Amino acid sequence: MFKRILIANRGEIALRIIRACRELGIETVAVFIEADRGSAYLEMADAAYCIGPPKAADSYLKIDRVISAAEIGNVQAIHPGYGFLAENAHFAEVCRSCNIEFIGPSHEAMALVGDKNAARRLAREVGVPTVPGSDGLVKDSREAVAVARRIGFPVLVKASAGGGGRGMRVALDEEALVAALKQAEAEADAAFGNGELYLEKYVEHPRHVEVQVLADHAGNAIHLWERDCTMQRRHQKLIEESPAPRLDDSVRRAICDSAVRLIKAAGYTNAGTVEFIVDRQGHYYFIEVNARIQVEHPVTEMVTGIDLIKAQIRVAAGEPLPFRQEDVRTRGAAIECRINAEDATKGFRPSPGTIHRIIPPGGFGVRFDSHVHTGYTVTPYYDSLIGKLIVHQPTRDEAIACVKRALRELRIEGVRTTVPLHVEILDHPAFSEARVDTTFIERTWPS
């Protein structure tokens, strides 16, 4: 087992990893930006090094600075968390060339599944359903129009290296497609340094279902069942739950089996998420692989009782999975609400500032993952996530009642948050009946 791990991230996920390491008897090294200096969660690490100014390009995305901190801190491994360098295959390769274990998949597997076009091709090869679309990358607008005519409008333009909703555009006709190609290419090139695009048939009103997978270096690969992430706005998830409601058991098992088949074919190790969409007829289609821990991993932890961060660390240290597929059972229902410092009444405008008071909720089955505290300053430099409210109860109805109570109990003063919106969503009969799709929030709360 590792003696010391560097956490190449910040905020709630950094604190989550620090806590897991402490329980495993592992020392931690944190890295931080100048604007986060003095944050209370940094005091929980055994060492902390400043790696630069607030801009991510000059700090968390600077591979040389992260590696330098790792060498100064004398660590044996780096946990990337999510975002920043978490899905950067080059970073994973650099870590291992410096004899530092990257807590995640190999750089080869990451490069394979991180290329969405290559991942789709692999999925088709192993019999995992994919959305109809281009056979590969589209070279120009003429080829894109030809593909769209073949599969039919509407179509979805997607960046091969994309993620988080960036580099994606829906086109309803040929004129819109030409414009969407230019916009998606520019956005993807700016965000990922890669403007390559491909086309998919746009599946209208789908649900978003993803599968948590875990694989070790001994060839064992399993799934930890599914999460429903349908409640999202512009491809940004707001509420996640497990198990997915109103999902036929045969579809549930087929999706989970498909996810394992795909990661085995990719030679994937460690934790990852295989994402799918499910149409109104119950047909499911592979979207992409997230080669990292997900923001919403706690809902899976709650229903399975498996600590995913500890599992990641143990797998990276060379340990085999301590359980088989048949050992992984789910119990009850879990729901997570992402609490963002945003004003949902004004187009989800970020609300940076100082938190004057925060009182987290409590009670049976309630978990609040957050790094913030009274006096903490929410900076404008990064995403606005300030906490995750997770509940676990015997049934979905009880989980909904619990999370609604916990949201009303949560007090955050000094910045505007998405708490009022979460309450409205959870009060809506369409949510309680699980009769929603990925456009539900935008249609119901347009802004």
What are these regions (language model features)?
Residues 147-156:
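Acidic/histidine-enriched active-site and ligand-binding environments that engage anionic O-linkages
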Residues 59, 84, 112, 137, ...:
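Alpha-helix initiation/capping motif
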Residues 133-134:
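Conserved beta3 strand of the protein kinase N-lobe
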Residues 1-125, 138-146, 398:
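ATP-binding N-terminal substructure of ATP-dependent carboxylate-amine bond-forming enzymes
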